[in-house]
């Protein structure tokens, strides 16, 4: 499960971090979070769909940047004006096309270059591992802020920037 490159991996981790922040901001302590891999019920597609929605919300909220997102009910909303007989077939074909565009092309969670279904599933394994690393931790209101600092220090210091001669300056 090789990652395409270290800079890409770092950017994907930042995208996941944005998702985690949005999810924590929107949820109270007793709510079920969306930033998690639900073993037994989730697919790579359902996980990535939730992450895409959270990322869109985060980019709009924190960066004031609009992100294109295709919701699951996009096809139904698009073709409501068609007759029932033709609409079912049209929705099926449109859904399949959108699914391919949405999941089998590079995106904000592509740790690997994704341009087909096989690569999507390879990337999905990596994405699940990354989500599972973070899902049990709380970023907002956490007394363990040092853990987050240590994590980013390790990411920056031990791989992502050393190849370019750039180093992270540790906190005293």
Predicted regions and their residues:
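Long recognition/docking surfaces used for binding and targeting
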Residues: 18, 25-160
């Amino acid at each position: 499960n090789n990652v395409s490159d270290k800079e890409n991996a770092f950017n994907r981790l930042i995208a996941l971090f944005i998702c985690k922040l949005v999810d924590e901001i929107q949820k109270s302590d007793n709510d079920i979070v969306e930033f998690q891999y639900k073993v037994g019920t989730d697919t790579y597609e359902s996980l990535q769909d939730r992450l895409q929605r959270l990322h869109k919300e985060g980019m709009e909220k924190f960066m004031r940047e609009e992100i294109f997102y295709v919701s699951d009910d996009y096809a139904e909303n698009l073709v409501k004006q068609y007759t029932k007989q033709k609409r079912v077939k049209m929705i099926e074909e449109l859904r399949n096309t959108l699914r391919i565009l949405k999941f089998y092309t590079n995106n904000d969670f592509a740790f690997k270059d994704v341009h087909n279904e096989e690569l999507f599933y390879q990337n999905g394994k990596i994405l699940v591992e990354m989500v599972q690393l973070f899902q049990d931790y709380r970023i907002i209101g956490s007394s363990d802020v040092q853990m987050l600092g240590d994590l980013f220090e390790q990411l920056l210091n031990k791989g992502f920037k050393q190849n370019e001669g750039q180093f992270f300056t540790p906190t005293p």
